[in-house]
Amino acid sequence: MQSQRERPREDRVHEETRGADHAHPSVPHAAAAASATATETATRTMSLHAGGVVVVDGKEKGKKEEGEGKRKGKAPATAEAVRGRARLRGEQLRQLHEIFLRFDLDGDGSLTKLELAALLRSLGLRPAAGDEIHALIAAIDADGNGTVEFDELASSLADLILGPCRPSVAVDQAELAEAFRAFDRDGNGFISAAELARSMARMGHPICYAELTDMMREADTDGDGLISFEEFTAIMAKSALDFLGLAAL
């Protein structure tokens, strides 16, 4: 049997993405677990807006001592990347670093195309087309070595979600529709407070009345007491920022 180190990197990325979905929501502003089914992703996001989010396991997988895992001849972080990293507050930087380590499976301090795509999926995002991940890496990869280091990710992630690169990243509408139907138990096109509470409990995330009230207030932007698909989509689209605590940047 092949060891973890011997197995192909791509196989381990897929396995890591599949297996990281069993954490329980608890600590506010913690990192999202790796991507799973659309309904589970939606449940995590709705739980976030109740004041708790899914926590990636506490182990900083792949972490090495300072100086280890550096590629020979690897370019130092650019001044722009260092400035971008400085924009993040300490807790934000810690959370982002946990996510980075989770997907840097061989611990070499950088993300490949496949690892970056898996990280984006863990935040509820996906490349709009397969070849556009190359454009995302090019936009983030300040030193041009073909991979993404942590300083580059810290510098670029807010712009990736909010700025000029946004057309390259999209919330998966088909998966959102599937998740919405799981909450909309009577199929009338809206999620009521009762449906939301029952769905959260059924999916293993029971919520109290105060949490339910907060969730409805956050999602129900028109104040009609129901969550429409458009409102559901909006709350999901902002989840990546909230997971990382970047919304205030």
From Swiss-Prot:
Residues engaged in binding Ca(2+) 4: D220, D222, D224, E231
Coiled-coil annotated residue ranges, if any: none
Binding site for Ca(2+) 3: D184, D186, N188, E195
GO terms for MF: calcium ion binding
Paired cysteines (S-S): none
Biased composition (Low complexity): 30-56
Domain EF-hand: 91-126, 128-163, 171-206, 207-242
Alphabetic keyword roster: Calcium, Metal-binding, Repeat
PROSITE patterns xrefs: EF_HAND_1, EF_HAND_2
Pfam family of the protein (one): EF-hand_7
Name of this chain's protein: Probable calcium-binding protein CML12
Species annotation: Oryza sativa subsp. japonica (Rice)
